[in-house]
Amino acid sequence: MKKNSQIRAKIIELREKIEKWNHHYYQLQNPLVDDLVYDKTLRELEKLERENFFLFSLEELNQSPSQKVGSKITSKFEKVAHSSPMLSLNKAYSNEELEKWAKKASEILKTVTFFVEPKIDGIALSLFYQNGNLIKALTRGDGVFGENVLVNALKINDEFIPKKINYLEDLEVRGEIYIDNSTFASLQLETKKFKNPRNAASGILRRYKNHKPKIDAKSIKFLEEESDFRYLKSFFYTLVNPEKHKINSQFDSINFLRNLGFQVNPFQKKCSDLKDVFNFISIIKQKRDFLNYNIDGVVVKVNEFSIYEKLGSTSKFPHSAIAFKFEDDIAKTKLLAIFATIGRTGKVTYNAKIEPVTLAGSKISSAILPNYSYIENLKLNLNTEVYIKKAGEIIPQIIGSVHNYPKTNFSIVKNCPKCNSELVNSESGLDQFCQNQFCPEIILQKIVHFCSKNALNIESLAQKRIEKFLEKGLISSACDIFYLKDKLELIYERLSNKNQLLTKQNASQSMQIKSIMKLLNEVERAKNIDFYRLIFGLGIRNVGLKAAKILSRYASNLSELRNLDFNLLKNQHDFGPVIIESLIDYFNNQKNSEQLNCLETVGFNFKTTFLTNQSNSWASFAISGKLSKPRDEYVRIIEESGASFHESLTKKTDFLLLGQSAGSKIEKAKKAGIKIINEVQFFDLIKNSKKT
């Protein structure tokens, strides 16, 4: 009896934990744990409930989160019943589990086929059309009732949420709203309030505004938030009641949706059998790190709709589809220590030392912890077991504790680990900064960034050599690098070891001095760079490579950049108030002004690869499909030719560069009269543009 009591208590504890996680995930857009930790806990609950169902009444079993979808709706949006339940998907974690699921379909239909596509980590949305017009947009909610977020769906770009379609029958389609990774990175420059792309997509889609304020100074924040809807994208994958539209398979329904102008994932396949399914899953798994959106597995569906009714469903998921989850990139290890490091902007990053463990083929001994709030939320404890995940990151992340603890036993770092200055919290309260401009670590990291590949690309000045130059008093700022040539005697003297005095006469025989001469040659070459590289190298907070390229269109040298009215850029090219404020703060800082004064004396010969005004660009390009080179390479070529690039098709788009497995852009380009070109034609255009 005592054992039963303990098991019941354990099940109740797991239920409460999952209910809390569901509320934070679905309603607050603030996930407390990683999906892999959530799935492990839910599976543990399901197993315990299966084996000990007799400990609960039928009503208690039905109220378990293992039997429900989503979370209770608590928002201010209108609550609307779904035409048919918006169910979740059952999960398979191994080939054996997938085979077991597929066996039931094979028993009903001997020649069953399957449809496979990536499982997008986004926000489920159901759209309703009458007479070709969008009239309703429901979130998943609790699976039975959803929130009608039509007012927000109407603000999303037509390419991703069609407001009008060429189909007059009543139609309901379901899909996923998401933010791609590169867009999320840009969004993070403007606000740090979103933890991940899914969190951002949910926060924007479910943003509630009960009125539109007057257009005055106080409404600026409202207008900025309204523009966030441009970040949202979509993939649609479900046609509700397909037989009503004479659609008999998932493959046909995807083509139907594509022809109506809905975004569908181009990375999908109709598979003839399970062997074909497993092969395609392997391909998706290999390529997922190269996708520009997050996936947490694949969805496998029975292709033939004719057997869906016989397959049936539970209250939580249908038997006609299953999610195959990737789980091999999570491991268990021991958290040995946590320590803080300082970056070039003074931002504090917490780092974890862990017991070495093999993960995704690599031996891992460290992990990243973004900030102290992350440590607090996960309730991480030193010398305890933790889960660690690697999904494309160079440095893996700790995603949760194996065991439950009431709080963390690691205290927040209050002083800079290098200069001991008191750390200051950001406005959001999430990040901490060292604001001592003379902090040796900040100075070091600024110079490291200045010399990095995407900035001045001075390979001979790696971090260890920069540390040595700082230690010996040979440099104190990035600009000093350009005057090392005037300090040769001092370099010979201070870099000589105790056993060998280096003089100017015998210096040529020294490998060390040869290395110095190589460095000086690289420094000289660095004077002939694209201006955007220097802007990026300045290390202005929130100004990344993309923003630096845009700034180089408005200024061709440091003097012009310093005199630029940055407020003119507000709400252009994704330049929001955070970037504008960072630019103004940087150029108003006395220490930065001294650095800029020094750099203006260097004698740079900047390449003029970018237009000073984007409105003068000779053409506008968009890209669809897989090309022979990485997409970033084509974007670089486009921009350096003086043309402009856009992720989406617009009225101003002149050319669509088409690769393999192109998506719906091709049909939209044809309708809009946009010229479609291949790679050969593209390079001919670029070549000819340089002649004019």
Curated annotation (Swiss-Prot):
Its EC top class is: ligase
MF-aspect GO terms: DNA ligase (NAD+) activity; metal ion binding
Active-site residues are 119
EC number per UniProt: 6.5.1.2
Q: Which residues bind NAD(+)?
A: 35-39, 88-89, 117, 140, 176, 301, 325
Q: Which domain of life does this protein belong to?
A: Bacteria
Q: Which UniProt keywords apply?
A: DNA damage, DNA repair, DNA replication, Ligase, Magnesium, Manganese, Metal-binding, NAD, Zinc
Write the protein's name.
Answer: DNA ligase
